[in-house]
């Protein structure tokens, strides 16, 4: 052993991040998932605070940040960190009746 430590094993895998900007009067946009706000802070050189959210689904570690732009107040920037490990609840509520109907119709073919 030469005394050097391999830190590559100790590094935590970073979650994928992506952000987008949306023109909206509402600060919180409905994306189909349920979120719990866990923080808010003032950001240097910004008129608007940044809000922090976590997905409420058990064992899902996705987070998002939401902030209105100071220079373009009609724009909200949303940044997601991570990938959901469960289906979108709103999508499932929409699809469930359709899937039951298709299952019913398949009995006749």
From Swiss-Prot:
Source organism, top-level taxon: Eukaryota
Gene3D superfamilies associated with the record: WRKY domain
Xref: SMART domains: WRKY (SM00774)
Subcellular location: Nucleus
InterPro entries for this protein: WRKY_dom, WRKY_dom_sf, WRKY_plant
Keyword Zinc-finger: no
PANTHER family in the cross-refs: WRKY TRANSCRIPTION FACTOR 43-RELATED, WRKY TRANSCRIPTION FACTOR PROTEIN 1-RELATED
Name of the protein described by the UniProt record: Probable WRKY transcription factor 43
Organism: Arabidopsis thaliana
Gene name of the encoded protein: WRKY43
